[in-house]
Amino acid sequence: MNGVTSHASSAVALPDRFIHLLSSMIRSPSVVGAEHSFFRVLQRELEERGANVTWYEGVLVAQGDEPNSVMFSAHIDRHGLICTGPNEFQYAAFVSGARSDLLGNSVSEQLMKKIVNRFESESVFAYEPWSGAYRGRGLIDRAYICEFRNNLIFELKGLDHLVAGTPVAFRDNLKSENGALVGQLDNVITAAALVYLFELGFQGTAFFTAQEEAGKSWRYLLEWFRRFGHSTNQLIVVDTSPYPDFETAKQQTLVLRNRDANAVFNTELTRKLVDICEANHFTYQFKDKYVEQQNVLAKQRGDEPASLGSTEMGRIISASNGLVDGTTLQIPTSGYHTLSESAPVESVAGFLKVLTDLATLN
């Protein structure tokens, strides 16, 4: 299936051209804070499909002939490492977000412990951040929490020659197994879907943002809307949404939200997504309601409640003072922020169908 490793077929078939596009894009590195080379890949793919492409700091904007008809946004950064010294590497999202104990904005010990063993023995490769030129491959040898800096440090085999500032990406290939697409999907899968929309004749606007994993992408979007937007602007942010396991993830086709920890989303636009889901007989879940239900159970167990989550959409609504409004559409996944993140094929197919309905491409 166009370069995808396949172990089992699914009853739902995804378009071959979408799979081919995603397979290619997932092999192109886009580490948090070092996304320039991936923007170049995106520019080529989008212009080949007829889009008008413009670069701004932290955001690439692709537009058709009716740019105000529908607006989508997807972040394009993926987790990886940054060389910070001789054979020393740190988690790129922490570096890009300036999250270290030195600045009083430290990463929680709980989060570091969650990550420290996540990528043990994974294959990686280094690249030039602007051109994407290959700078060698290696293997994660060790990861530990440095007690002096209260930060997560990685040691690699085979990349001793790298200088500080060089990004290191995880080696990844798209796989199809047991009714799921598997790989480092967040968030290249929805970015590929927006590129694919232009292949189908999409004439609206798609934003591709950098540094979402470092909490910065919403700022780049807001800058654009302040400069080029109308008095009010409606946006649909697309992403993946994590669940504890694959069985839980595939209980719903798609994930919607009424709100996140930052803001309430646009009720009318959210209702439109509900109507499209119901018209296509897609099941859906409101993630905020799911978290609230899980928190009731957590309280009964004596555990700490989980946050409603902080999304790009919520952040921009909160900060824009009414300039930007909108909602989210998400693909449920398991294995979040790993190289084995799994998205049900049925959910990916449903996601593409809702996008095309929103863009009136039927």
Pin down the residues of each PLM region.
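N-terminal hydrophobic/helix-forming segments and targeting peptides
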Residues: 1-362
